[in-house]
UniProtKB/Swiss-Prot annotation:
Designated name of the protein: ATP-dependent Clp protease adapter protein ClpS
NCBIfam families: PRK00033.1-2 (NF000669), PRK00033.1-5 (NF000672)
Function statement: Involved in the modulation of the specificity of the ClpAP-mediated ATP-dependent protein degradation.
Species whose genome carries this gene: Pseudomonas putida (strain ATCC 47054 / DSM 6125 / CFBP 8728 / NCIMB 11950 / KT2440)
Segments of this protein annotated with the region Disordered: 1-27
Superkingdom as given in the UniProt entry: Bacteria
Biological process (GO), any one: proteolysis
Gene name for this UniProt entry: clpS
Annotated family: Belongs to the ClpS family.
Amino acid sequence: MHAPSEIRLTFNQDRPQSNEDDGSGLAVQEAKPILQAPPMYKVVLFNDDYTPMDFVVEVLETFFSLNRELATKIMLTVHTEGRAVCGLFTRDIAETKAMQVNQYARESQHPLLCEIEKDG
């Protein structure tokens, strides 16, 4: 018959193996850091006396994927209150959208201004 073989399980691969058992048999896992949501930024459109309302609606539909009704509502807010929030995004996305809107407005020879503001 065969002699019984000894099976040794190692739970912690980080420590070097030794022939002596310390009795713990447990691996210690480091605590994971608590993740926080990134700060959000508002993309804001400002009113001017020269940009046509239809162009503002087009910008809102194109760059913010808004439907015609919501785009028109935001455009009217820009027109009557002087400014309106188009969306809330992380910083990189907000900066990119504002840059794209400003570039498109300049290429179309309109003075429409779009900026970002930290939310909160």
